[in-house]
A protein has these predicted regions:
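Bacterial N-terminal signal peptides
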Residues: 16-28
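Von Willebrand factor
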Residues: 37-104, 113-156, 159-162, 189-204, 232
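Second-shell loop/turn segments in exported
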Residues: 46-56, 88, 104, 120-131, ...
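VWA/integrin I-like adhesion module and closely mimicked acidic/polar interface patches used
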Residues: 78, 165-210
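Short beta-strand-loop
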Residues: 81-120, 199-210
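Von Willebrand factor A/integrin I-like adhesion domains
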Residues: 192-248
Length: 301
């Protein structure tokens, strides 16, 4: 015959987590929020996937970006920061309704994390696109940066835009540009000016200098051949991450109507490639024509 055992217990009501939180708040008690990730730089990369960019050109851009992040000098620039880490997110843009975030925030602090980032970028499928809304690229980039402030805190915030033509869809370029710059975000540009490509705008670097780039230390790196995209991205990243304004001044080689024309002094890439030229952002002949492509009904870019 089994004996029954009576166990004396005390009664403790079980409260749900939300109810516990409400009661703690009622009595002035709070639970500590998770600590935000501290980084030197929040960098958003915006890639044009409008109909003027064919699949091979986009592949060269994706591959070039991945290769640039794997470059030892880029990794070194990241590690030489005060915190030794940056955060990177990416998205594809064309017309505003077609824009798509392709990679959420990745923290880069060494070669292994750079390799993981590069693999993700290489494997990113193409987003279908139509026109070119650079204004919406700035707006989405700013949204990505600001919406992550509780989780990732950076001393500098940068949007980097790469495309092959002026704004021709979405909101006015000047309005989007000024709003983003007022938020303390720097915008740099990587315009593609390949005269063998479908979309070719010969003065796109000047357009970018006047209408797209902005904020302290902002600059434009022009790409004249898709095969040189990796070298241009590499130079841009080194300058962007280190933000060495002394290096920029010492590297000055000439001046154009758009402002100082600079060459970066960094280690040469393995394959011979023209040294990318860097144009500092500033007013020029395009300053009054930032929306030359129209608002959804101009150009073919």
């Amino acid at each position: 015959m089994k004996r029954s055992h009576t166990v004396k217990t005390s009664f403790y009501p079980v409260l749900s987590i939300p109810l516990c939180g409400a009661l703690l708040a009622l009595f002035g008690w709070t639970t500590p929020a998770p600590a935000a990730e501290q980084v030197d730089l929040k960098l958003v990369l915006a890639t044009d996937v409008s109909r003027s960019i064919d699949d091979e050109e986009l592949r060269l851009e994706r591959e070039g970006t991945a290769e640039a992040f794997l470059d030892p000098e880029v990794v070194k620039a990241i590690q030489n920061g005060s915190l030794g880490r940056i955060a990177v997110a990416t998205f594809d843009f064309s017309s505003p309704q077609d824009n798509r975030v392709t990679m959420d925030w990745h923290i880069i602090h060494d070669r292994a994390s750079a390799m993981a980032l590069a693999e993700t970028i290489r494997d990113t499928p193409r987003t279908p696109g139509r026109r070119t809304s650079v204004s919406s690229a700035l707006e989405l980039g700013a949204l990505l940066i600001e919406s992550s402030e509780k989780d990732i805190v950076a001393t500098r915030k940068v949007i980097d835009v790469s495309d092959d033509g002026p704004n021709n869809d979405g909101n006015r370029m000047t309005e989007a540009h000024d709003k983003v710059i007022a938020q303390g975000i720097v915008v740099n540009g990587l315009p593609v000016m390949d005269d063998n490509a479908n979309g070719y705008f010969p003065d796109l670097d000047k357009y970018y200098a006047a209408c797209v780039a902005g904020g302290r230390g902002s600059f434009v790196v022009a790409v004249h051949n898709y095969k040189d995209f990796s070298a241009a991205m590499r130079h841009k990243l080194i300058l962007e991450i280190s933000q060495n304004e002394t290096q920029i001044r010492h590297a000055q080689t000439g001046r154009t109507k758009s402002g100082p024309l600079l060459k970066l002094t960094a280690a040469a890439p393995a394959a011979p490639s023209p040294t990318p030229q860097v144009l500092r952002a500033g007013p020029n002949e395009f300053s009054s024509r930032c929306d030359i492509g129209g608002f959804g009904f101009g150009g073919g870019f």
